[in-house]
Amino acid sequence: MQKTLILAEKPSQLREYVKALGGFTQKGDYYESDRYIASSALGHLIELAEDTAYRPAGKWDKSYLPLVPPLNSYVYEPKRNDEGRQAHLKKLAQLFNNPNIAMIYVATDSDREGELIFRYIYHYFNCKLPYKRIWLSALDYSEIRQAFAAPKYKQGDPFLENLSKSAYARAITDWLIGANATQAATLQLGGDKLLSIGRVQTAILKIVCDRYLKNKAHKKTYTYKLITSHSYNGVAYTTESPIYESKAQAEQLLSSLATAHSFVSFQRKTERKNPPLLHTLDSLTIVANKLYKYTAAEVLASAQRLYEGKLTSYPRTEDAYITEEGYNKLKGFLPNLVNQCLNIANFTFPASLPASVNGAKITGSHDALVPTGQTNGIEKLSQQDQRIYTLILHRCLESFSEAAIYEKGVYEFENQGTSFKTHTSNLVQEGWKKYSPKVKVATADEDDSEEDTNFILQLPYKQGDKVTVEKKNLKEIESKPPAIYTPASLTEDLCNLSKFLQEQSPEVYAELQSEFNLKGLTVGTDGTRPNIIEQLVTIRKYIAFEKNKYIPTELGLQFYNAIKDIEVVNVAQTARLEYQLKQVAEGRISVTDYYNRLTDYVKSTVAQIFSLQSAITASTRKGLGTCPACKKGQIVEYEKSYGCSDYKNGCKYSIWKEIAHKKLTAKNIEDLLQKGKTSLIKGFKSKTGSDFEAYLVLDKDLKPAFQFNSKKK
């Protein structure tokens, strides 16, 4: 009997499929049942080959730049420096070539990256088997069973083809810009330093540096307004004049005030503040940083764990809406869930559909971030994961509640020709605000919302009534510099490129808006931005993260100043690339047309970099020890490995950052190189998934090898 091969993206996902579908027996790295053989990809098993596949062997050199392979000549190869993944790929090849397999069910993550992982493997194996696409928004067992009973997409579906093309276009864009611009910058400006340029990371670096420099260059200016104090029936209140640029004018007006105001009018209006939409990953990041100072990477990690624990839906979503079907499902369990988790009883849903329930507005691959209704494991969550989970619950309650309604009032007075006003605000219907998270961590660049402060004042004055001025003074208002970015404010700008450009660069915004619609464009994606920002801090060392603020380092500022005027750093060019990638995803332009534009841009970028003169002198990476291979360079930390600093002269020695599912620290590598042996490292995982501990030493081929504790019984 022929069977269907299930391909998951990672082992944890695979185990959930196996449990949900039932009837499986484990056979080494895969599972088998009467209908299925199931395995996982261990994430990315195949990747685009390094630049050495297209250029002469040896060290980097300007002579072969720009390096632009023909579109159809890109080489795919097994994941580099990862023997575990390479060995797994060989086992997976046996399953793909198994004559008993008649169909593949693609069950990698239901997003662009998950599609790319499968397509790379499928083409690398030159596989001809038909396939269907499993599409999941959550890992609860009922949804898994439904998805496998009726796969959402068949091979060749236009949505899948556009998704695949978009993923491939992004991959070759990042490869082409990264390989060319990084080598050009390193050769032209770096001296002995690697200077990394990337489509998204360099745009983020520019945005952070621009804001920091504006903050530091800010020169204080002052404006002025008159404040008068009054009381009625024991209730004190103040009135304020308009703002004046001239202190002398304000002082003259203050001195000329009469002893009493004349009452002019009272204007009342009702204001509605509608509930927020459901959480996307970006909105969750913004709230979590404002409340708990978590970074985007920390929020993503928590959201991913909650998803893998079947507690919430798929985290990498850009949509804040759900379908009516999804809403009805939530109505079935949300009141009991929030009673259990938040101690909120008797929650009731509104009579009409909330604004966040609108399937027609779902433009991406996934609905908004919501709970699944599962409760197993909630009590075991870490504090961070628990906080993120409760934020998702709170947002559901907020989104499914009535509007908050305020009664606003303005009392206006006049004194010697100067207008004075006092404002009142009364929250008459709490609505969704009743369910807002109560925890608040204040940040220096946040102002309290005026509408959330109740000030009820009832004055019985009639027009012309005199109101005694009990006290008067001049208030000096100091101008504020643009606030240095926090994870919240940076995410807000990166996920709304249109608003960012409109506020920060109106001329650029107008120019771009005349070319195309900026709505919906972002810098990078919600799934990639957190890790790119983290790399700028921990790997590139271009940005420091201090006291919840992103501050460029000396190296970051030097690099920014050297390249700030070239096209690859221009946020307008980032917007153009994002728009073109969006067109590919929507099937409006072909990958070929896009690639032709991209290669012209890359060639221009390399030429611009080679015209630069400023050398980068700031220190970048700490040497952890002498390279054991060439004996010349230092082993330093890179994005995915610890490698030789003398790479430009051909030394390719490196130690992969993750061995047996355990990330190695810089201290581990330092001990290995300088002492010949690490301290005892716990948390390695065997191929069967068992935990073990060991020392690391270098074998005769200079590769890390396990040395087990002989004293352990």
Question: In which residue ranges do the predicted regions lie?
Answer:
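Active-site phosphate-binding and catalytic loops of NTP-dependent enzymes
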Residues: 25-29, 155-161, 183-187, 213-218, ...
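Metal- or metallocofactor-binding catalytic centers and their adjacent structured scaffolds
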Residues: 246-279, 285
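Amphipathic alpha-helical transducer elements in NTP-driven molecular machines
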Residues: 11-18, 35-38, 42, 82-93, ...
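Intrinsically disordered, low-complexity regulatory segments
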Residues: 1-171, 175, 481
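C-terminal or mid-to-C-terminal helical accessory/interaction module adjacent to the motor/catalytic core
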Residues: 99, 143-230, 268-269
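Basic, low-complexity terminal or inter-domain segments flanking catalytic cores
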Residues: 2-5, 24, 80, 93-96, ...
